[in-house]
């Protein structure tokens, strides 16, 4: 096949390729990517660009280029969420919920609930990199106490005191503003949300 023409730019040490992902991914080596983070077309609007891609072709390339311990993280919204999970149910693991600050279905609020969330779906073959981005909470001290053998902990004796300075593991619901912060695309996702997901599922210098 003829190599497609690509516009390549270097930004902050990263190479940017402009083109159809189904043209670019075949040029990439097998098992070379640690994280695929994509905001695919949902097929939920009348916009010309909002057409669902061929998911069979997409998964063929995703499965080929992703590392065995890599993560595939895809934004979605119903009914596209169900379609996307069903297209690769064996690799689907769990979802995050992006809680918005502004609802998006303005024209339908008299007929259905105001929509304040989207889904973020996580797929992988084997346990990927997971760097939990700790959240702030109330500090506490877990006092020493006796413990007996149980289902989870077979140890017996005195459990040491645990001091927590307020860090909490992240919940599956993350709130980020979807207000217009100079965005140039009607469905553009918050930059901070994308940063959060990149930090969670990859390390510095990963591809």
What label would you give each PLM region?
Residues 1-207:
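Core catalytic lobe of class I
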């Amino acid at each position: 096949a003829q190599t497609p023409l690509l516009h390549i730019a270097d930004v902050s040490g990263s190479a940017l390729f402009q083109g159809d992902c189904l043209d670019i991914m075949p040029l990439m080596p097998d098992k070379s990517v640690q994280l695929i983070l994509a905001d695919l077309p949902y097929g939920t609007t009348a916009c010309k660009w909002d057409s669902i891609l061929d998911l069979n072709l997409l998964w063929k390339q995703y499965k080929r280029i992703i590392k065995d311990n890599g993560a595939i993280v895809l934004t979605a919204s119903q009914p596209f969420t169900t379609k996307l999970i069903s297209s690769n149910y064996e690799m689907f693991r769990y979802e995050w919920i992006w809680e918005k600050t502004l609802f998006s279905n303005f024209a339908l609020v008299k007929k259905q609930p105001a929509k304040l969330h989207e889904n973020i779906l996580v797929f992988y073959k084997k346990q990927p990199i997971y760097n939990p981005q700790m959240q702030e909470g109330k500090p506490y001290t877990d006092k020493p106490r006796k413990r007996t053998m149980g289902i989870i902990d077979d140890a017996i004796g005195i459990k040491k005191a645990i001091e927590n300075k307020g860090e909490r593991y992240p919940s599956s619901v993350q709130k980020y503003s979807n207000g217009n912060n100079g965005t140039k695309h009607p469905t553009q996702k918050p930059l901070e949300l994308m940063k959060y997901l990149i930090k969670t599922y990859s390390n510095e210098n990963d591809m």
